[in-house]
């Protein structure tokens, strides 16, 4: 994923009211920008350190600038915009980086599914007759032999992981009833004969492994263990990030 134009740099002053952040620009002026992260952002807020932001030319926006990345007090880069995680995942699937999700013909985003009225982040299917053009004509990275049974549909729920504590990456950074619902929906898909995959997109260059934050949301941690035992696949991939672009490059261990 390339950022055009590249993100601009500022200095973090404060985050408040969840969606607002004050920064200092290179000319010394102070401005308020949009914070596209609904989580607690625990251990992601470092006043006085560098931040990077994008700028929209949409005149209807109250805040034209959006906080995208931050630098920690020890120099790690953190992806603040959780909305980037789904695109990073899609790009990596198309490029064949996420080997666990290769070989499908169709990729669709935000498809309704489940008994709790959710929308799956990514739906992969082996439907060669699909009108979906998400792969832009690119064949899957590993094709099935002719006349073999089609792959089961693969429901992929994407979560952005940015919480680093004592060298360990954790998800979530706050209690998430929505995340618990998504785990139940994935279990339901597995029970119906499909694949259910929880994909952690690690947007923190200091995180080397991921595990459920039982000390923050014990219900989520317990449900994740149950989901994994029920057949939900849990994987993580780490992002390389800069003001010019970002991409998922390598698998990251998940401690279950």
UniProtKB/Swiss-Prot annotation:
Pfam families: SfsA (PF03749), SfsA_N (PF17746). GO terms for molecular function: DNA binding. Residues 128-149 are annotated as: Disordered. Residues 128-141 have a biased composition (Low complexity). It comes from the Bacteria. Belongs to the SfsA family. This is Sugar fermentation stimulation protein homolog. It comes from Shewanella sediminis (strain HAW-EB3).
